[in-house]
Amino acid sequence: MNYLIRRKTKEDCAPVVHVATVVWNETYKGIVDDDFLNKLYETEEQRAKEIYNKFNEEDNHQLVLEVDNNIVGFVNVGDTDDTNYDNCGELHAIYILGKYKGKGFGKKLFEAGIEELKRMGYDKMIIGCLVGNPSNDFYKHMGGKLIKTRIFLLFQLPENVYYFEKI
C-alpha cells in the first residue's frame, strides 16, 4: 500500500469534502442528528464548489493522505479561537476513511499536522473532539491532556478539549 501526505491543492477540494462527508456519517451516527448527516451527501457537490471558490494557497494548512493515488484522509490545522494559551495552534480536523483506520495513518497525519503547526510558529496545540467520538481515545494515546469540555456550537453538543503542552 503506497501512501503520500502532501499539501492540499485546489483540485483536492471535492475529494476532501467527500472524505469529510463519509467520515462524519461513519463516526457521528447516534451522536449528531441523522437528518444533518444525510444532508451532507445531498450538499456535497455544492460544499465542494464553495470551498474550491474560497481556496487560498497562502492560508492553506490542510494536508491530504493519498493511498494508492486516492485521497482517503486529511488533517487541517491552524490558529485557535481559544485565547487561554500562548503560542497555541489547533488541530481542527483529522479524518480518515474507516477502512484505512488502524493502519498507522492517523498517527502519520497527526504528526504531519504537528509539523505544519511548528512551521506556523506554534509550540503548543489543542484539539476538540465531540464526546462519544472514538477518536477521544486516540488523542489521549497521542499524549493529549483532557483540560475541559466545552460546547461545540454547530450542534450544541459537548466537546472534549485536549492540550498538548509541547509539540
Where are these regions (language model features)?
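Short, solvent-exposed coil/turn linker segments
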Residues: T9, K108, Y163-K166
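Conserved glycine-rich acetyl-CoA-binding loop
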Residues: A93-E111, K118-M120, L130-D137, H141-M142
